[in-house]
Every structure is written in C-alpha cells, then in structure tokens.
Amino acid sequence: MRFACHSIPGAVVHHIQFEKLDYGESNALDKFYNSDVAIIDLSVQVQQNQLFYLLGLRENFGMKQNILLYYDTDKEATQQTKLTCANNSFVSYLLSPDNYLVTTNPAIDDTMRTSLVSKLKHLLEMNEVQSKVELY
C-alpha cells in the first residue's frame, strides 16, 4: 500500500493503528477525518463495526473519497462485505501462490488478476490526491 501511495506525486502517507482510532486518540481521529483519501482494511472481522462507524462519521463530514480493502478468504463473505460498501471503492485481494498481493472479484471466479499496488495506484490517481493519504 505504501508503495502505491508513494508513487503519487505530493502524497503524504500516514499509517494509523486501529487501536488508536478505537481508543479515540484525537490526533489519530483528526488525521482520519481530514485526510483526502482514506484506505481502510476491513479484513479483521472484530474491527469492522468500529471502522464502519468511523467511516460513516467521515462521510458525514463530506469526506467521501475512501478505498476499502478486504482480504478475500471466502467469496461469499467478500461479496456480502462488498455489498455493504456500495458507496465506496471496494477492493478485495489475496496473496497469490507467487507471494504477490492481487485483486479478486468476488462476483466471479476470475483468473485474470491485477496487482493490488497497481489497483491502488489507479484508484488514487482517479481521486487526484494532492495532499494526504491515510492508511488504516
């Protein structure tokens, strides 16, 4: 993720641990709510409710440029999560046998996969990131 973010000229990348957001640390929440684009990994099931809550608050502040990631271990669960995230860019991914992170499509059994870095770079370029990108 960092590689994709650093490939965007002028992007500033911050990685914020979930625990800081969950605890309500003001500096972490300020960065989260004020970032131009938030990249949020929803792969950890027990973190999803809090992340969706924080994402909803972020959207209420008018910050609608969000990229949601999900590690695809179960096509059905991935598809259900994707449907929940319909208003955001959703990218499911997995680790290929060659040890590369690649995107998946939960709706079909796809064999043509894009690298996760390429997909993130494309989405960031579409969002015309000028200042800050946050990783969660």
Predicted regions and their residues:
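Gly/Pro- and small hydrophobic-enriched strand-loop and loop-to-helix capping segments
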Residues: 61-79, 83-87
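C-terminal interaction surface of TIR/SEFIR-family domains
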Residues: 84-136
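Conserved N-terminal substructure of TIR/SEFIR domains
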Residues: 1-24, 30-35
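Conserved beta-strand scaffold positions in the cores of enzyme catalytic domains, especially
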Residues: 15, 66, 90-92
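Conserved beta-strand-loop-alpha-helix hinge of the TIR/SEFIR fold
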Residues: 31-64, 71-73
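Eukaryotic basic, amphipathic alpha-helical target segments in cytosolic regions
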Residues: 5-12, 46, 120, 124, ...
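Amphipathic coiled-coil/heptad-repeat helices and related helical stalk/stem segments
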Residues: 24-25, 51
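Residues at the C-termini of beta-strands that transition into short coil/loop
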Residues: 17-19, 70, 94-96
